[in-house]
Amino acid sequence: MMKELKGAFHSIANNKEMTLMQETAMETVWHEFLHCHSKAWKNGRVSSAVPLMETLNEFYARQTYPQFVAKFGGRGTHHKEIRKNGIGYYNNSVNFQTLLKHFGIGQGVATKKIGKMLGDTYYDDFFNVLHDRIFKNKLSMIDYKEIINRLSKGELYFNDYLKLI
């Protein structure tokens, strides 16, 4: 990945289009930067909260990495591919996007709300705050918990489970 990251900065410096893997490297760095700018943990790392925290951080990173790239003078041209098939937290990311679509929640709306969460909410509280801000009028807390706990499952399993809700 370091080779791709160096290549990304070289492409930006030379005003050239980045490759898909170079953009993926930039999105990965943005994902990690987002951790540095978040409120992080209130009560120390809670292992059960990690999967959802990483899912939301990755979702936001995939949606917004072109703005990060633009700060260096570059342009994200593979945004659609990375949003859909990025390499970080693949099942969680794909399933979360499926969940949003299933309930008619636009990715732009979700991006804004999750971006706000990254800045004002401790990771420990993501589960409840996500429900309150995005899914409260769509899912009971019981169904929401069951769905969130299945985000890491394979796409087919997740899609089949979602049909039951």
Go through each PLM region and give its residues.
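Pan-zinc metallopeptidase signature
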Residues: 89-165
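Generic structural signal for hydrophobic core residues of well-folded globular domains
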Residues: 33, 37, 60, 64-65, ...
